[in-house]
Structure formats: structure tokens, C-alpha cells
């Protein structure tokens, strides 16, 4: 094979071309590729962090919902207990009021009964005196009459 100056020139030109590419062309290309790889890695890491944050937020939301439900249940139970307490107090108060009204009514009935008995005794005494006056057919003075009425009332 015949090595002549052309092949030697081409070899030198090729070596210079490779050196030029390695020195001036290759570094910006590699820098752009590395920059892009870094951006992609950052994007993936950010997506992974966002996914973890979402999972954490969902877990927190679930925990808060459970806590809120438990608190709501406690509040409902307290409200039911308070309702029962109020109902019991109202029943007791109504029972006391009923007993008071019944006692008052019984006292009024007893007072009315005594008054009616007293009135009846007086009327019976008056009728007895009137009957006695008619039977005896004489007049009795007023002082003696009231004394007789009082004695009859006491006896009845």
C-alpha cells in the first residue's frame, strides 16, 4: 500500500478535527445533556416528593376525618345525655307541680267540705230551732237563740 502525503494530510486533518471537536464541540453538548439529565432527575424527584406529600395529605385528611367523626359522636352522646337529663328534670318538675296542684286541690276540697258542713250544721240548727219554735209556739229571745245554735253546732 502506498502511503503518500495525501493520506498523511488527511490523517492529520482528521486528528485535528477530532481534537477540535473534543475541545470545543463536545463539552457544550455534554453540558447540555448533563443539564437535561439533571432537570429530568429533579422533575422525577419532585414528582416523587409530590406523590409522598399527596399520600401524607390524604393520610392526614383521613385521620382528621376520623377525629372529627369521633368528636361528633362524643358531642352527639353528650347532647343525648343532656337531653335525657333535661327530660328527667322536666318530668320531676312536672311531677312536683302535679303533686302541688293535687295537694292544693285537696286542701281546697277539704276547706270547701268543712265550710259546707259548717253551713249545713247552721242550717240544720236553724231548722231545728224553727221547728222547736213552731212546736213550742213561743218566742225565745235572741241571746238564748244564738246560745242554742252554738250548742247544736258543737254537737253536730
From Swiss-Prot:
InterPro entries linked to this entry:
ATP_synth_B-like_membr_sf, ATP_synth_b/b'su_bac/chlpt, ATP_synth_F0_bsu_bac, ATP_synthase_B_chain
Subcellular localization: Cell inner membrane
Q: Which domain of life, per UniProt?
A: Bacteria
**Topology relative to the membrane, per the entry?**
Single-pass membrane protein
Name the predominant localization: membrane
Sequence similarity: Belongs to the ATPase B chain family.
What is the protein name stated in its UniProt record?
Answer: ATP synthase subunit b
Q: What does this protein do?
A: F(1)F(0) ATP synthase produces ATP from ADP in the presence of a proton or sodium gradient. F-type ATPases consist of two structural domains, F(1) containing the extramembraneous catalytic core and F(0) containing the membrane proton channel, linked together by a central stalk and a peripheral stalk. During catalysis, ATP synthesis in the catalytic domain of F(1) is coupled via a rotary mechanism of the central stalk subunits to proton translocation.
State any GO CC term: plasma membrane
Assembly and interaction partners:
F-type ATPases have 2 components, F(1) - the catalytic core - and F(0) - the membrane proton channel. F(1) has five subunits: alpha(3), beta(3), gamma(1), delta(1), epsilon(1). F(0) has three main subunits: a(1), b(2) and c(10-14). The alpha and beta chains form an alternating ring which encloses part of the gamma chain. F(1) is attached to F(0) by a central stalk formed by the gamma and epsilon chains, while a peripheral stalk is formed by the delta and b chains.
Gene (UniProt): atpF
Q: Which GO terms describe its molecular function?
A: proton-transporting ATP synthase activity, rotational mechanism; proton-transporting ATPase activity, rotational mechanism
Transmembrane regions listed in the UniProt entry: 11-31
Species of origin reads: Serratia proteamaculans (strain 568)
The protein's UniProt keywords, in alphabetical order, are: ATP synthesis, Cell inner membrane, Cell membrane, CF(0), Hydrogen ion transport, Ion transport, Membrane, Transmembrane, Transmembrane helix, Transport
